[in-house]
C-alpha cells in the first residue's frame, strides 16, 4: 500500500437519547490508500488489474488497467484473408464463439452483398442461442461463486455440458467452433439434432427456473447485490453500454429487435428488462436478473427456429460461400447481439486485396468495463467483487 495523503472529514455521531442531539467531531484525519486488485485476483475474471484509491473501506476511485491479454487481433486481421479471420474472431470472447463468428460474418456479407440460404439463417440463430445460454450459465455460476455460493456454480456447469455436447456434435469442437462461415456454415445439422435439442429444451426449462429462484430469492445473494453498483439509464447510454448491462438499467435495447438481422424479425421473443420486483433498477442484481430471464427467451427462440426451419434433402450449407472473397472498395459496420452486448466489426476494403485494409472490433466488454469508475464510486471494497461479476467481462475480448 502507498500513502497518498491525508483528508479532513467531519463525522456526526447520534446519541442514544434522540436524533436531535448530536455530537460533532471535527478534524478527524484518515489516510487515502492505493490498493491493487489483480491481475491475479480470481474474482477479476482474467488478467484485469484494478488500482483502487480507498478511504478506509470506501472506494474513492477504481482505475482498470488493461492489456495483459493483448493478442494483436486487429493487426492479424490485416495479414490474412477474410475467411482466415474467423478463427481469430473465435478467440476473442471464447465463451461465445458462435456469436462472435455471427457478428463478423454479418459484416463481411454486408460488404459482399450476398444472400444467405434461409435454412442457414435458422441454423445460425439456433447455435448462437445455444451458445448464449451456455455463456449466461458461466456468468451466473461464476458470479455466485464470487459471492460465496458454490452450489449454483455446480448446477450451471452441469447443465452447460448438455449445450457444449450439442455444439460439439454439430461443429466438432467444444469451444472455438469455427462453424459459422462467410456465406454459410461448415456442416449441416446431424440427423437427430432437432429431436435432441428439443429434448434438452424440455429438460432445461424447469432447471432454469430453479436456478433463477436459487439466487434471486436467496437473502444473502440479494443483500450482496441489491443497490450495489447503481447505473442510471442516461449514464449507461452515455457510456455506450449495451446488452444485459444496458437492459439492466431499464433500457429496452436489443440488436436482435432493433436491427432485426437474420430471421429474428420472424421470431416472437421479449426484450428482458428488470421490473424492480427483485432489485433496484440499474444495480448489480438487475444485471443478473436480465441474464437469468434471457435464458428463458433463448429457449423460446430455439424452439421456434426448429419449428420454422425448412427441411431440405441433400442440403449443402456451403453452397453460398464464395470461392474467392475480394469485396469492392468500401467500408461497412456489422454488428450482432452477443451475450455481453453489441459486438461490431468495422471493415474497410481497398477493392484489390483478399485481405481487409482495416478490421476494427467494437468490444462490448471493453465499453462496459470503461464505466468502472462510475460504478465503484463510494462503494465498499468487498462490493467491488459484486460489481465486476455483474459486468461479466471476458478479457480475451476486452484486450483483443
UniProtKB/Swiss-Prot annotation:
Keyword Nucleotidyltransferase: no
InterPro entries (alphabetical): NADH_Q_OxRdtase_suD, NDH1_su_D/H, NiFe-Hase_large
SUPFAM superfamilies reported for this sequence: HydB/Nqo4-like
Superkingdom classification of source: Bacteria
One example GO MF annotation: NAD binding
Entry annotated with the keyword NAD: yes
Main subcellular location of this protein, as a coarse class: membrane
E.C. number(s) listed in UniProt: 7.1.1.-
Record's catalysed reaction(s): a quinone + NADH + 5 H(+)(in) = a quinol + NAD(+) + 4 H(+)(out)
GO-annotated cellular components: plasma membrane
Keyword annotations of the record: Cell inner membrane, Cell membrane, Membrane, NAD, Quinone, Translocase, Transport
Subcellular location: Cell inner membrane
Protein topology in the membrane: Peripheral membrane protein
Broad enzyme group: translocase
Protein function: NDH-1 shuttles electrons from NADH, via FMN and iron-sulfur (Fe-S) centers, to quinones in the respiratory chain. The immediate electron acceptor for the enzyme in this species is believed to be a menaquinone. Couples the redox reaction to proton translocation (for every two electrons transferred, four hydrogen ions are translocated across the cytoplasmic membrane), and thus conserves the redox energy in a proton gradient.
Protein family according to the UniProt entry: Belongs to the complex I 49 kDa subunit family.
NCBIfam families: PRK06075.1
Subunit details: NDH-1 is composed of 14 different subunits. Subunits NuoB, C, D, E, F, and G constitute the peripheral sector of the complex.
The protein's name: NADH-quinone oxidoreductase subunit D
Lineage: Bacteria, Pseudomonadati, Chlorobiota, Chlorobiia, Chlorobiales
Gene that encodes the chain: nuoD
Amino acid at each position: 500500500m502507498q500513502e497518498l495523503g491525508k483528508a479532513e472529514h467531519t463525522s456526526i455521531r447520534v446519541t442514544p437519547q434522540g436524533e436531535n442531539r448530536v455530537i460533532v467531531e471535527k478534524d478527524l484525519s484518515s489516510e487515502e490508500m492505493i490498493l491493487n486488485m489483480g491481475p491475479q485476483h480470481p474474482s477479476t475474471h482474467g488478467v484485469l488489474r484494478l488500482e483502487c484509491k480507498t478511504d478506509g473501506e470506501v472506494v474513492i476511485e477504481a482505475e482498470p488497467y488493461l492489456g495483459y491479454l493483448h493478442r494483436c487481433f486487429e493487426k492479424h486481421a490485416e495479414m490474412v484473408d477474410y475467411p482466415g479471420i474467423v478463427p481469430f474472431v473465435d478467440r476473442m470472447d471464447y465463451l461465445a464463439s458462435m456469436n462472435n463468428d455471427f457478428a463478423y460474418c454479418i459484416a463481411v456479407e454486408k460488404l459482399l452483398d450476398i444472400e444467405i440460404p434461409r435454412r442457414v439463417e435458422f441454423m445460425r440463430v439456433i447455435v448462437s442461442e445455444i451458445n448464449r445460454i451456455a455463456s449466461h450459465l458461466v456468468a451466473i455460476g461464476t458470479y455466485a461463486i464470487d459471492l460465496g455460493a458454490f452450489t449454483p456454480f455446480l448446477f450451471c456447469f452441469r447443465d452447460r455440458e448438455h449445450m457444449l455436447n450439442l455444439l460439439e456434435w454439430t461443429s466438432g469442437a467444444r469451444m472455438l467452433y469455427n462453424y459459422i462461415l462467410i456465406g454459410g456454415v461448415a456442416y449441416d445439422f446431424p440427423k437427430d439434432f432437432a429431436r435432441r435439442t428439443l429434448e434438452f429444451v424440455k429438460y432445461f426449462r424447469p432447471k432454469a427456473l430453479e436456478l433463477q429462484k436459487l439466487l434471486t430469492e436467496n437473502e444473502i445473494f440479494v443483500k450482496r447485490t441489491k443497490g450495489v453498483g447503481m447505473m442510471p439509464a442516461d449514464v449507461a447510454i452515455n457510456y455506450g453500454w449495451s446488452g444485459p448491462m444496458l437492459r439492466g438499467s431499464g433500457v429496452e435495447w436489443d440488436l436482435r429487435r432493433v436491427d432485426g438481422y437474420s430471421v429474428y424479425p420472424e421470431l416472437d421473443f421479449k426484450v428482458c428488462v428488470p421490473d424492480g420486483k427483485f432489485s433496484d433498477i440499474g444495480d448489480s442484481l438487475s444485471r443478473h436478473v436480465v441474464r437469468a430471464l434471457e435464458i428463458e427467451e433463448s429457449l423460446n427462440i430455439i424452439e421456434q427456429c426448429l419449428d420454422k426451419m425448412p427441411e431440405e434433402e441433400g442440403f449443402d450449407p456451403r453452397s453460398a460461400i464464395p470461392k474467392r472473397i475480394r469485396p469492392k472498395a468500401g467500408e461497412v459496420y456489422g454488428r450482432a447481439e452477443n451475450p455481453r452486448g453489441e459486438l461490431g466489426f468495422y471493415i474497410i476494403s481497398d477493392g484489390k486485396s483478399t485481405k481487409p485494409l482495416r478490421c476494427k472490433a467494437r468490444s462490448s466488454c471493453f465499453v462496459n468495463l470503461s464505466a468502472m469508475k462510475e460504478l465503484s464510486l463510494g462503494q465498499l471494497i468487498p462490493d467491488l467483487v459484486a460489481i465486476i461479476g455483474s459486468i461479466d467481462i471476458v478479457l480475451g475480448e476486452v484486450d483483443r
